């Protein structure tokens, strides 16, 4: 803001920062303590408005404090000084959102600024500044060419005399200057976020900061945004193909070249249209149900995204004893790759497999590590799979060739999660939200926390409900496999139809080249014919169908009564789990209450009799016998 437009306030010394308030929370312990649900962690990022560069970040957990603070230097918020003539030429014009503060001040004489010049940044210690929010109600205050500060009425925070260093959403203050002033460490600031639970932080809030200096008030803009923080390790794929870890979102070419000519124009076969039962929404519904049981706060407002490229599934480790039997596995492992395996699990290992050099060394529970025997077969328990280096299977023989490792897992769809505001940013037009955020795989780490640490307990039956939801989701994956089998059937029928068309074309070509001895002679081939081997596909698909039906029957026969209770009506399940605790306490009181009451009454009677005897002894003298 220039001096010709308005009269700026008089300069005074900066107002000292407010003292830090210490809030003590006292938790009262009762005889019965409610089970508390775990709160998710969040990361608050302080970034550049124009480039998205991260200046500072801090971690915050809901319920721990009502404020989030950043420690950052004033010069960190400004861009790096231009070093070359080309960089100077590419600098944005003054007011274009970010300016070269070092070039703006020039570092000549006693002038100050940010950069490597000696004493330049130290001179900023006596310079005031002011801030304007990017979401000001007045539309004229949202001008990025003036750093959201085209007028003094737009200012909400300021360090000069009479200005406020605190607003309803943000406060900023200087901290004591360091004794040793080095580059980007001369003007430390404390930026505090108020009400971190507010939904507006998901979208990100931006401010413009301008220095109160003679002439043009140079400035910069920054953004503070809240993101769900999930700790997760690098994926550990297992299967025949382990190099398919493409990102969930990729740019596709705008145009596709379709100029490749077709050799023959053949009539399209008239296939009967077949409809598959849609399973994607049911899979996402199962994931959200499980997420709602284990992490209800995250499930309140979120977007679930399925991965569009293989591998489509991930595994959650299961610690259980594998069933052994005679060599009776009739199907070989399917060539499906599990994108990641999380948690601890039971493992099968064959001779020659180097587990110490494998990423699954920490995954395999040493007490449940089994060496594969060539005389038996191993079968996964109900609702689980064996994710092997050769593929995915329910049963595996000990005679499988080559070094082999199998991990017992629950197979789950590879799902990515966005918070509600971030998901809306994802589908918004690019001109509204130019900066997209990379998806974070959330499902597997949360489920690993459920099975290892029990961090998802939200009530007395939360763990049982979480296990029930996990089994339900695993069953949904089986249904998805069934749909894949139906899709293979349709593709098989299409291949059969295409084969018929090809044979018809071959007959026509044989007639056309009859004078040359037929098509094979014209092409110079000694033998050319089509061998239809689709019967093998049909037989394999039939076995897959039989295995799915058999596992479904075993699952229905082995459901415990306490798990079947959670398949009832939701309100009835909630009522039963809510009344179970009080009813159990009442039953124990009726059984042991009379005994405890009689013991207490006898104790009281004994104490009363002892007091009476003591009182009587004080009223009389003891007679001495001669």
UniProtKB/Swiss-Prot annotation:
Signal peptide limits: 1-38
Tissue-specificity statement: Expressed at higher level in thyroid. Expressed at lower level in adrenal, bone marrow, brain, breast, kidney, ovary, placenta, prostate, skin, testis and trachea.
Highest taxon, organism lineage: Eukaryota
Motif (CX6CC) on chain: 520-528
Post-translational modification: The CXXC motif is highly conserved across a broad range of retroviral envelope proteins. It is thought to participate in the formation of a labile disulfide bond possibly with the CX6CC motif present in the transmembrane domain.
Ranges spanned by the short sequence motif CXXC, renumbered to the chain: 302-305
Transmembrane segments: 576-596
Extracellular side: 39-575
Topological region Cytoplasmic: 597-626
Subcellular localization(s) per the UniProt record: Cell membrane
Residue span of region Fusion peptide: 439-459
Ranges spanned by the short sequence motif CKS-17, renumbered to the chain: 503-519
Recorded GO CC terms: plasma membrane
Site (Ancestral cleavage site): 438-439
Pfam families: TLV_coat
Function field: Retroviral envelope proteins mediate receptor recognition and membrane fusion during early infection. Endogenous envelope proteins may have kept, lost or modified their original function during evolution. This endogenous envelope protein has lost its original fusogenic properties.
UniProt domain comment: The CKS-17 immunosuppressive domain is present in many retroviral envelope proteins. As a synthetic peptide, it inhibits immune function in vitro and in vivo.
Family: Belongs to the gamma type-C retroviral envelope protein family. HERV class-I T env subfamily.
Protein name per the record: Endogenous retrovirus group S71 member 1 Env polyprotein
Organism: Homo sapiens
Gene name linked to the record: ERVS71-1
């Amino acid at each position: 803001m220039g001096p010709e437009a308005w009269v700026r306030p008089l300069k005074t010394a900066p107002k000292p920062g407010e003292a830090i308030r210490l809030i003590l929370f006292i938790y009262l312990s009762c005889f019965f303590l409610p089970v508390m649900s775990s709160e998710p962690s969040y990361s608050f990022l302080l970034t550049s408005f124009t480039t998205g560069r991260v200046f500072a970040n801090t971690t915050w957990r809901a319920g721990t404090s009502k404020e989030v603070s950043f420690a950052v230097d004033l010069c960190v918020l400004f861009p790096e000084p231009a070093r070359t003539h080309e960089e100077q030429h590419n600098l944005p014009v003054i007011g274009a959102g970010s300016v070269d503060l070092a070039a703006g001040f020039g570092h000549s004489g006693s002038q100050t600024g940010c950069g490597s010049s000696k004493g330049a940044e130290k001179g900023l210690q006596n310079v005031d500044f002011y801030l304007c929010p990017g979401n000001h109600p007045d539309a004229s205050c949202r001008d990025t060419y003036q750093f959201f500060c085209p007028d003094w009425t737009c200012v909400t925070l300021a360090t000069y005399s009479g200005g406020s260093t605190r607003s309803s959403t943000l406060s900023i203050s200087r901290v004591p200057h360091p004794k040793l002033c080095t580059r980007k460490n001369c003007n430390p600031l404390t930026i505090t976020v108020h009400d971190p639970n507010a939904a507006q932080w998901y979208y990100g809030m931006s401010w413009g900061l301008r220095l109160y200096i003679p002439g043009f008030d140079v400035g910069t803009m920054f953004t503070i945004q809240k993101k769900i923080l999930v700790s997760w390790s690098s994926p550990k794929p297992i299967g025949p193909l382990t190099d398919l870890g493409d990102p969930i979102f990729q740019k596709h070419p705008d145009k596709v070249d379709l100029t490749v000519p077709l050799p023959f124009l053949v009539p399209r076969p008239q296939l009967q249209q077949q409809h598959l039962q849609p399973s994607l929404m049911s899979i996402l519904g199962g994931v959200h149900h499980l997420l709602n049981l284990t992490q209800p706060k995250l499930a309140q407002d979120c977007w679930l995204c399925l991965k569009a490229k293989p591998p489509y599934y991930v595994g959650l480790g299961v610690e259980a004893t594998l069933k052994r039997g005679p060599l009776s596995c009739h199907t070989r492992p399917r060539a499906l790759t599990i994108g990641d395996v999380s948690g601890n699990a039971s493992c099968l290992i064959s001779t020659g497999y180097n587990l110490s050099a494998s990423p699954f060394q920490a995954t395999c529970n040493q007490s449940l590590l089994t060496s594969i025997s060539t005389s038996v077969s191993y079968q996964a328990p109900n609702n689980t799979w064996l994710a092997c280096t050769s593929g995915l299977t329910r049963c595996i023989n000990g005679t499988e060739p080559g070094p082999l490792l199998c991990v017992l897992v629950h197979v789950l769809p590879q799902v990515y999660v966005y918070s509600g505001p971030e998901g809306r940013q994802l589908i918004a037009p690019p001109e509204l939200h130019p900066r997209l955020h990379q998806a974070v795989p959330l499902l597997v780490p949360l489920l690993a926390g459920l099975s290892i640490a029990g961090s998802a307990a939200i009530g007395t039956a939360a763990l049982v409900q979480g296990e029930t939801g996990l089994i339900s989701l695993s069953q949904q994956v089986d249904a998805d496999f069934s749909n894949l089998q139906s899709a293979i059937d349709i593709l098989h029928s299409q291949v059969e139809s295409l084969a018929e068309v090809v044979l018809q074309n071959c007959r026509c070509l044989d007639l056309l080249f009859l004078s040359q001895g037929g098509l094979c002679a014209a092409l110079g081939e000694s033998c050319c014919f089509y061998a239809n081997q689709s019967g093998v596909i049909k037989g394999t698909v039939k076995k897959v169908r039989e295995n799915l039906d058999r596992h479904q029957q075993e699952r229905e026969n082995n459901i415990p009564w306490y798990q079947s209770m959670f398949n009832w009506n939701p309100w009835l399940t909630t009522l039963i789990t809510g009344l179970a605790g009080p009813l159990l306490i009442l039953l124990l009181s009726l059984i042991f209450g009379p005994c405890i009451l009689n013991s207490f009454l006898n104790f009281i009677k004994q104490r009363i009799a002892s007091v009476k005897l003591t009182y009587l002894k004080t009223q009389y003298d003891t007679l001495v016998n001669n």
